Regions:
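Extreme N-terminal leader/targeting segments of oxidoreductases
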Residues: 1-27, 45-48
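Glycine-rich flavin
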Residues: 23-25, 41-48, 54-190, 223-227, ...
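N-terminal Rossmann-like FAD-binding beta1-loop-alpha1 element of flavoenzymes
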Residues: 24-52, 203-212
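Glycine-rich Rossmann-fold phosphate-binding loop(s) that bind the pyrophosphate
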Residues: 31-34, 57, 197-200
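Rossmann-like NAD(P)H-binding beta-loop-alpha module
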Residues: 188-230
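A short beta-strand/loop micro-motif in the catalytic core of glycosyltransferases
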Residues: 249
Length: 258
């Protein structure tokens, strides 16, 4: 049946781990991203004692740390650089942009830190029933997890660990210093060139942003077009713009060996 949680006011003794058999929490959340924080907010509304365990990425998860926030920020930075050197009006002569790549990345990092603080940590900072813990959780049994050598018991568990980058099994890939979105967005030194494997929405976002910031970009895609999940007219329009901006597109290419 549906799980039943005890009701009680925030901070009330009815939900205190100390009053549970073995000091159990009402809810243990494994993960620290948007789903985990949404669950923590709901649990606080219900007056549940909650433990949030987060390992890997900082609190806030993929979106704020290595996903939507940094990618859209860099897209906007690239857009500003592009419009500083391109005009659709004959009477307007753009003078170009002086791009400080390192400063762009540092500004991105500041934005990430600010949003992590204001949109996640500050939201739960005054929660009376929530305990946040950094570390990796391992299940010892159906009611117990171990974090950093200590055991914690829970009546219910929510696994909200998100996703990780799928690394393709390409021969020799593990022997080179390849990048994923996790590591690419941290680079403060501008690379001379960038080869992107895959022309989905993540690959095309990165390609457009970094190309406009002065990086020579090539995309390899094993299907016939970019954004294969969209209709062909969208792909054609985007491909035309990308080629006009100097991005090299290689459809029907599959990396097999490094």
């Amino acid at each position: 049946g549906s799980p039943t949680f005890p009701q009680g006011s925030p901070g009330g003794s009815s939900t205190s781990p100390q009053d549970r058999p073995g000091g159990a929490y009402d809810l243990i959340i494994i993960g620290g991203g948007s789903a985990a924080f949404s669950a923590a907010i709901k649990a606080e509304d219900l007056g549940l004692s909650t433990l949030m365990v987060n390992g890997g990425l900082d609190f806030g998860g993929t979106c704020v740390n290595v996903g939507c926030v940094p990618s859209k920020n860099l897209i906007r930075a690239g857009e500003a650089a592009y419009h500083a050197s391109h005009s659709n009006f004959a009477g307007i002569k753009p003078r170009g942009a002086d791009i400080d790549f390192t400063q762009v990345i540092q500004d991105k990092k500041k934005l990430v830190a600010t949003l992590q603080e204001k949109k996640y940590l500050d939201v739960v900072s005054d929660f009376e029933n929530l305990t946040r813990l950094e570390g990796w959780a391992t299940f010892k049994d159906e009611k117990t997890v171990e974090v950093g050598g200590k055991e914690f018991k829970g009546l219910k568990f929510l696994i909200a660990t998100g996703a990780s980058t799928n690394i393709p099994p390409i021969e020799g890939l593990k022997d080179i210093d390849y990048l994923t979105n996790d590591s690419l967005f941290e680079l403060e030194e501008k690379p001379d060139s960038l080869t992107i494997l895959g022309a989905g929405y993540i690959g095309t976002e990165i390609a457009m942003a970094y190309n406009r910031l002065g990086v020579k970009v090539r995309i390899m895609e094993f299907t016939d077009r970019v954004l294969r999940s969209q209709t062909p007219d969208i792909s054609e329009a985007l491909e035309s713009q990308m080629r006009n901006e100097g991005i090299e597109l290689l459809p029907h290419y599959r990396a097999v060996k490094f």
